């Protein structure tokens, strides 16, 4: 069985993330979305909320599982029996960072490959940070995230607004 993990903070999950996830399922029997706990980042959503948002977003993808993790990505991959780490690339600046990360992961776990998937052009500018920024200013983010994620973001930033 070919198993991969797709790690990230997913704060929040975007249509770009979902595009990478759907395409990864074409290559692997099982893809585990590894929702990271990162003590260096302050997240808008708790780990449990991020997992729930992802579960709803990926409910039609039968070979996808969502799990939280803390620590080294390659160690989590080993625990899951995965032999690949999926990473999405939007632009050249993503590649430089991801390349360094892939080299470090290869040193830590030579048996685990990093697979890069390019985002579709319509998602190349989307980031969780820019979506949160726009939402905080009451901008329209409906084309960047699934509807349930949009509602959750607006509830965080603008609790006075009704669904």
Swiss-Prot record:
Q: Show the Pfam families listed in the entry.
A: CTP_transf_like
Which residues does the annotation say bind ATP? Answer: 9-10, 17, 88-90, 98, 123-129
Q: What class of enzyme is it?
A: transferase
Official protein name in the record: Phosphopantetheine adenylyltransferase
Which cofactors are named for this entry? Answer: Mg(2+)
Gene from which the chain derives: coaD
Enumerate the catalysed reactions.
(R)-4'-phosphopantetheine + ATP + H(+) = 3'-dephospho-CoA + diphosphate
Carries keyword Nucleotidyltransferase? Answer: yes
